[in-house]
């Protein structure tokens, strides 16, 4: 039995960047934000997986993929001083032979955990990933994937 395309099986939600509260401003990332995001990501790495640290080149590579639209596929939370508190990326890598997968990456600076930033970020990532699945003409399974370090 043939499956219908994902666009006929998945309903696209309304996707909007989170709104700020408590001095937090959300916006899409730009390449100019890489160093600020790296600072946040290195604190996350130190707390969650100290034997593996994200390096600048990895972030640059993620931001430069032809299949990443920074304006639509990223969300970053900043404090009033411009410090990154949380960041997220949704990417759909090529090679969709057996499934269409949306990978949800990012995290929350350890000192800012417990404020609800992660819940807001994940909600946005799930919506954006679902929106991307709903735009696919593929007749494959669709997955939203994320990874947890503990």
Language model feature labels by segment:
Residues 109-111:
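Active-site acidic-Proline motif in GNAT/NAT acetyltransferases
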Residues 146-150:
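Short, intrinsically disordered, charge-balanced linker/junction segments flanking boundaries
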Residues 24, 73, 140-144:
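Residue-level recognition of the N-termini of beta-strands and the immediately preceding loop/turn
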Residues 74-76, 82-92, 103:
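Conserved beta-strand in the GNAT
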Residues 114-131:
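Conserved acetyl-CoA-binding loop-helix of GNAT-fold acetyltransferases
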Residues 93-104, 113, 132, 136-141:
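A conserved beta-turn-beta hairpin within the catalytic core of GNAT-like acetyltransferases
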Residues 2-63, 76-78, 83:
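Short amphipathic alpha-helix that is part of the acyltransferase structural core
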Residues 65-69:
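Short loop/turn motifs at secondary-structure junctions and domain boundaries
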